[in-house]
């Protein structure tokens, strides 16, 4: 699925070339059973998304992991567009770190893309011994022939934002990317851009704080993150810490795809803001708030005010549109970022959420809506939960969405999601004027899985996508 080229490596030469890539036909996504009451391992599902296929919207393969309660979460590749110039590299393995068990699974997606096989299991003890890290999150491939995985904590569940390095051929644990003793206080996501000698990482909370659910007292106690860490890419050390105003729980971070661009965006979940980070003329980095989703005053909920809870963000490959999900309020949003300092709302669509009519929550004061949104019903299925993980087609015309965040928080905020399972939906995107419209004929119902309702999470295409591939 690479650009046509006589001597090319994986992926595409540029983000704009990637936009010309083939339409997605299958999608991989992890399905979680931890906290659901079903004593079964998490598994990697393969879903057919080709409208011409007789198996359209069906799970066509399930690869169960050999252990229980891993909490599969995010995934990355053995190699991607960062290695486009190396014809010896090919995108054949999907790397799945486990958020809770700290196990890493390497899945063979190259031999038979529609019938995946487990290639290797990296046990937690190997990571603990060589890296003193645990609770693993984001996986990115590097042009150096390595895979880099971020951590949330140490072996005891205290906060520690470090990075595990794997050999991308043998998948042996090589050690940490950062210098010994140089980890950030907390960790979560990261994105690198070698042209500017920079990596920036984000932070959630220590594993001991978030493992079993959300306690508002932990926010008051300052146990949740509110910083970005700027790293020197060549020296592997933190050179700047950016404190975020109105930036509690900065989660997903995205540089612009154009590797010359020295700016990007991060979604701050609890504050429900989008912050733009950028490089100054002097070479240091700054951050500014560019979008604020106002909280809603409510009755019948955990707190008197409900944040949107921005949990995932994406940038289209042409760096024109930014998308994000408000998991609690229930809406997906599209912003035109042609002027990155002044994003302009161009599309909004409600996909479930906590404030739907007829639910337990009453909205008392709302700065944005005149009435509470209707519950979403697709093909007879009432959608539980709210929009969470999102993935955009290469051409930018289709947005896929799942509804599970993290099993412990799902159980707390959306107990019906545990009972009924999550769903995968597809939204049609207007890339000319802007706009979002639900495809009423698309539904993958993970409530009907053979072993019981499952929680489906992050989406990946076999040929790469706009949140896994980094151009250098």
From Swiss-Prot:
Q: Which reaction does it catalyse?
A: methanethiol + O2 + H2O = hydrogen sulfide + formaldehyde + H2O2 + H(+)
Instruction: Point out residues bearing the modification Phosphoserine.
Output: 111, 371, 467
Q: What does this protein do?
A: Catalyzes the oxidation of methanethiol, an organosulfur compound known to be produced in substantial amounts by gut bacteria. Selenium-binding protein which may be involved in the sensing of reactive xenobiotics in the cytoplasm. May be involved in intra-Golgi protein transport.
Give the similarity note: Belongs to the selenium-binding protein family.
After translation, the protein is modified as follows: The N-terminus is blocked.
Tell me where in this chain the PTM N-acetylalanine is found.
Answer: 2
Its predominant location is nucleus
**Membrane topology for this entry?**
Peripheral membrane protein
Subcellular location(s) per record = Nucleus; Cytoplasm, Cytosol; Membrane
Gene Ontology terms, MF aspect: methanethiol oxidase activity; selenium binding
Among its keywords, does the record have Cytoplasm?
yes
Question: What EC designation does it have?
Answer: 1.8.3.4
UniProt cross-references to Pfam families, sorted A to Z: SBP56 (PF05694)
User: What does the entry list under GO cellular component?
Assistant: cytosol; membrane; nucleus
Q: Does the keyword Oxidoreductase apply?
A: yes
Oligomeric form and interacting partners? Interacts with USP33.
What protein name applies here? Methanethiol oxidase
A GO biological process of this protein is: protein transport
**Sorted alphabetically, which keywords does the UniProt record give?**
Acetylation, Cytoplasm, Membrane, Nucleus, Oxidoreductase, Phosphoprotein, Protein transport, Selenium, Transport
Q: In which pathway does it act?
A: Organosulfur degradation
């Amino acid at each position: 699925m690479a650009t046509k080229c006589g001597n090319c490596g994986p992926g595409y030469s540029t983000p704009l070339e990637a936009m010309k890539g083939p339409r997605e036909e299958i999608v991989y996504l992890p399905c979680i059973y931890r906290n659901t009451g079903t004593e079964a391992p998490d598994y990697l599902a393969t879903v057919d998304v080709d409208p011409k296929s007789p198996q359209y919207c069906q799970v066509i393969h399930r690869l169960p992991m050999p252990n229980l309660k891993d909490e599969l979460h995010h995934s990355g590749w053995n190699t991607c567009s960062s290695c486009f110039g190396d014809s010896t590299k090919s995108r054949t393995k999907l790397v799945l770190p486990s958020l809770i068990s700290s196990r890493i699974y390497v899945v063979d997606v190259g031999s038979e893309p529609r019938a995946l096989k487990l290639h290797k299991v990296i046990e937690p003890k190997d990571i603990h011994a060589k890296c003193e890290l645990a609770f693993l999150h984001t996986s990115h491939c590097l042009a150096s022939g390595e895979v880099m995985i971020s951590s949330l904590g140490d072996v005891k569940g205290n906060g520690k934002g470090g990075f595990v390095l794997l050999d991308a051929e043998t998948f042996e644990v090589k050690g940490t990317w950062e210098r010994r003793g140089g980890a950030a206080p907390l960790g979560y996501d990261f994105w690198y851009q070698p042209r500017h000698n920079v990596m920036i990482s984000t932070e959630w909370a220590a594993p001991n704080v978030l493992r079993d659910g959300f306690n508002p007292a932990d926010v008051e106690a300052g146990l949740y993150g509110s910083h970005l860490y700027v790293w020197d890419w060549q020296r592997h050390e933190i050179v700047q810490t950016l404190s975020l105003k109105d930036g509690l729980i900065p989660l997903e971070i995205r540089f612009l795809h154009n590797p010359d661009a020295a700016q990007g965006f991060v979604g701050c979940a609890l504050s429900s803001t989008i912050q733009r980070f950028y490089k100054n003329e002097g070479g240091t980095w700054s951050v500014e708030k560019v979008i604020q989703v106002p909280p809603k005053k409510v009755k019948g909920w955990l707190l008197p005010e409900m944040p949107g809870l921005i949990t995932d963000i994406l940038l289209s490959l042409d760096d024109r549109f930014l998308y994000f999900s408000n998991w609690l309020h229930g809406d997906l949003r599209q912003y035109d970022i042609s002027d990155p300092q002044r994003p302009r709302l161009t599309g909004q669509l409600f996909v479930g959420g906590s404030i739907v009519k007829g639910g337990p929550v009453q909205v008392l004061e709302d700065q944005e809506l005149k009435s509470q949104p209707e519950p979403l019903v697709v093909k007879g299925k009432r959608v539980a939960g709210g929009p969470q993980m999102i993935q955009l087609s290469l051409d930018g015309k289709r947005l896929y969405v799942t509804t599970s965040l993290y099993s412990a928080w799902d159980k707390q905020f959306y107990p019906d999601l545990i009972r009924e399972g999550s769903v995968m939906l597809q939204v049609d995107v207007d890339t000319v004027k802007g706009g979002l419209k639900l495809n009423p004929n698309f539904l993958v119902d993970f409530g009907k899985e053979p072993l019981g309702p499952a929680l489906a999470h992050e989406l990946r295409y076999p040929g790469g996508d706009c949140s896994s591939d980094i151009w250098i």
